[in-house]
């Protein structure tokens, strides 16, 4: 139910291959609509140009659905928040252009959001029986493009104390999954198969990294060379293992 004190914010996310829109009333999520792009499956990874085109097709219906599910109209909005980055340039441009145009047309404030900060602060969204963390707390962001350990001191004060020095873990999962002929995205499939396998069966080199940093490129290369060697000796090695 709408009240005079209610603040409605439309959030728009388009940093990679999902077009998302959500409506918040104060700090409660009223709707969250996501359009996933299936076009990338045949390529085994996100193709930036195709992602941008798909965002252009999805952005209007996704926002319309988010508003409809929240049972409000554009005129009820108090502000619009959008992902400023990091992400794919073409994808970000679609979301930012739409958000800026809509805020200008409605005459309401525009809020730029760093989506890595948003990952860390998502715990503050109100949910039933859910406890929010106290500051400071340690956060870990693991996505297709980032792997970080962050000391979160306050809403806008954060220090990265560890990060990947090369590939993000999500990228390593997808690349290894492609080598294994797994469907994209490979992460869920690798996670499922790992529970059925023998962790002692094969051994791969472990990265030597100082401090709290990570490195996944060596693992990716190790898997590549291992599979090349095994499939050369046994053509059906992947299918049999």
Predicted features, each with a name:
Residues 44-51, 82-89, 160-164, 207-212:
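A short glycine/serine-rich beta->alpha loop
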Residues 82-106, 125-126:
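Short Gly/Thr/Asp-enriched flexible loops that form oxyanion-binding sites at enzyme active sites
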Residues 100-120, 164-168:
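Short, acidic/small-residue loops that bind anionic groups at enzyme active sites
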Residues 2-8, 15, 32, 133-135, ...:
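A short helix-loop
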Residues 6-86, 115, 239-240:
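N-terminal beta-alpha supersecondary unit
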Residues 1-5, 113-137:
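Conserved phosphate-binding catalytic cores of ATP/NTP-utilizing and phosphoryl-transfer enzymes
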Residues 22-23, 92-93, 122-125, 150-154, ...:
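Short acidic, glycine/serine/threonine-rich loops at helix termini
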